[in-house]
Amino acid sequence: MWHIFFIVNIVKIASWNVNSVRSRISNILDWIKLEKPDVLCLQETKVVDNDFPLSPFEEIGYNVKTHGQKSYNGVATLSKFLVEETLNGIPNYDDDQARYIETVHSSDLGMIRISNIYLPNGNPAPGPKYDYKLNWMKKLKNHLSETLLNEEIFIVLGDFNVIPDDIDTYSPEDWKDDALFKMETRKVYREILSL
């Protein structure tokens, strides 16, 4: 009698807008112990790199890569895998806000590139913050388009600050003037998804 076994390698990747990593450290650690992700991408860490609480994550086996700033924004990627490469910020885009980190992980599946984003909110719209949001999205789209040419495992995740469709909110009418819901935001978001 023959038995055929298939071994399926699964990589568990999660994303979480923590709204201050230092305020939520115990919640994050509890969740990690429960869910055991291979990679956890955090947004809105709200801490400069030198003050990021590395030790609690390193003590449970995570490699930590951060791109932070004081009191606002910030992204971090925690990985059980060796992180071979880290890119802070979208290339060729002069941006002083810490909203993008890209990491390459040496996993059981081979190399995995992960783009962890915290897309700008953009309110009030119209205005400079909305213009910044749209420009950021277009720069992101261009970078992702170029990176996809590498034909490697590439995962894009994070907090997109977009309401893609009417069904994604209880009351679309309440959101009609919000940057997250404006047609131009949704259009560029769909362009990113269609890459």
Enumerate the language-model features and the residues they cover.
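Active-site-proximal beta-strand elements of phosphoester/diester hydrolases
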Residues: 10-20, 111-123, 157
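N-terminal, active-site-proximal structural segment of metallo-dependent hydrolase catalytic domains
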Residues: 2-62, 72-75
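Active-site beta-strand/loop signature of hydrolases that rely on acidic residues for catalysis
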Residues: 16-17, 32-50, 114, 143-166
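Metal-dependent phosphoesterases centered on the DNase I-like endonuclease/exonuclease/phosphatase
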Residues: 60, 138-195
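Glycine-rich, phosphate-binding/catalytic loops in enzymes
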Residues: 30-33, 56-60, 94, 131-133, ...
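Structured beta-strand-rich core segments of catalytic domains in phosphoester-bond hydrolases
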Residues: 45-48, 52-124
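Surface-exposed cleft-lining segments at the edges of enzyme active sites
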Residues: 91, 119-138, 173-178
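Soluble or luminal CAZymes and related metallo-dependent hydrolases
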Residues: 20-24, 95, 132-140, 181-184
